[in-house]
């Protein structure tokens, strides 16, 4: 590897409101500049706005830092990240969403932690903000102390269950390359598959207990609009996670963890976000969620992680659906109708 760090930035239609500029400015202004040789790999995922023009302008201004990779067709974020991984030269790999930004010392602190501890995976916390600022907003703890240190089987189990966001970490490139790790393409929620799977291959995880990453909350964010297409993408991510874990020999050793993550992603999260967020939900889709989960894990509701982490109300509703899909569907829709009436008063 000829560089210390490769930062991969998937970009799709982020030209408006200075979002892309603010992200790129935070990357070229890193304090590691001059300390380490690093690269910023900007993958334009067939944008239909001026994103590519902005990227090419930054590449012209910072030729020693920025390399633009234009995709001819849209591959979604996972595919864009894969294109960056194909050409990355860094000893370490970092990812950032193109509408977010990072503190000037973000990568310096993560790399320093890696050098001090010998970790091959380093993360931090993040700040929720609704405008461009370096003032800290609501702080979200991304990972916890019991997940850090040398990754024993027990710690791998905890990290698999709650891997945290992938953009808040740097990854030793050799681990990615040697284990053929990449992202699902053509779907939303690619990290739902990649995050847990990747975590099983790293041997030492450390974290910087500071909110060094700024997560920009706005209305066009992937996670803020629920459609059946996006719900199906989450289901697909869960299926891919199951398949990858099975094919890579993890299904026996980490069965309870895989069962829970599959149930959470494919069924529980998707079920309630679908019913709450889609205007005209379909009973057939709700039935599909239950059957798809029971196909792999017929006794998912006895899983210890499910019993521990799934809320009592959600468990009650899912138990109702297991007895009668129609009764559950009618009950939930009526309850939601009543809530909406009260909210409009």
Where are these regions (language model features)?
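Short aromatic/hydrophobic "clamp" motif used to bind/position activated sugar donors
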Residues: 93
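Membrane-interface aromatic/basic loop that binds lipid-linked glycans or pyrophosphate carriers
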Residues: 119, 276-345
């Amino acid at each position: 590897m000829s560089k210390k760090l490769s930062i991969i930035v998937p970009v799709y239609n982020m030209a408006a409101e200075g979002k892309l500029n603010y992200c790129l400015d935070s990357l070229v202004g890193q304090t590691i500049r001059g300390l380490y040789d690093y690269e910023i790999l900007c993958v334009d995922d067939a944008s239909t706005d001026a994103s590519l023009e902005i990227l090419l302008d930054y590449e012209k201004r910072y030729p020693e830092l920025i390399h633009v990779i234009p995709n001819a067709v849209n591959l979604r974020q996972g595919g864009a990240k894969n294109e960056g991984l194909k050409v990355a030269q860094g000893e370490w790999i970092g990812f950032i969403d193109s509408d977010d930004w990072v503190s000037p010392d973000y990568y310096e602190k993560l790399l320093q932690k890696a050098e001090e501890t010998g970790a091959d995976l380093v993360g931090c916390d993040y700040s929720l903000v609704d405008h461009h600022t370096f003032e800290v907003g609501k702080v979200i703890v991304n990972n916890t102390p019991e997940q850090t240190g040398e990754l024993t089987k027990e710690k791998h189990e905890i990290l698999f269950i709650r891997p945290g966001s992938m953009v808040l970490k740097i990854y030793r490139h050799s681990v990615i390359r040697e284990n053929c790790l990449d992202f699902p393409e053509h779907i939303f929620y690619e990290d739902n598959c990649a995050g847990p799977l990747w975590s099983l291959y790293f041997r030492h995880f450390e974290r910087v207990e500071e909110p060094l990453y700024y997560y920009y909350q706005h209305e066009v964010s992937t996670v803020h609009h629920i459609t059946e297409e996006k719900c199906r993408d989450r289901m697909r991510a869960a299926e891919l996670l199951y398949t990858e874990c099975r094919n890579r020999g993890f299904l026996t050793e980490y069965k309870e963890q895989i069962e829970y993550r599959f149930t959470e992603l494919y069924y529980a999260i998707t079920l309630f976000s679908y019913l709450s967020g889609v205007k005209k939900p379909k009973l057939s889709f709700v039935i599909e969620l239950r059957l798809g989960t029971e196909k792999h894990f017929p006794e998912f509701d006895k899983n210890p992680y499910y019993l521990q982490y799934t809320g009592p109300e959600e468990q009650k509703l899912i138990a109702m659906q297991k007895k009668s899909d129609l009764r559950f569907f009618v009950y939930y829709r009526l309850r939601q109708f009543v809530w909406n009436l009260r909210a409009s008063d």
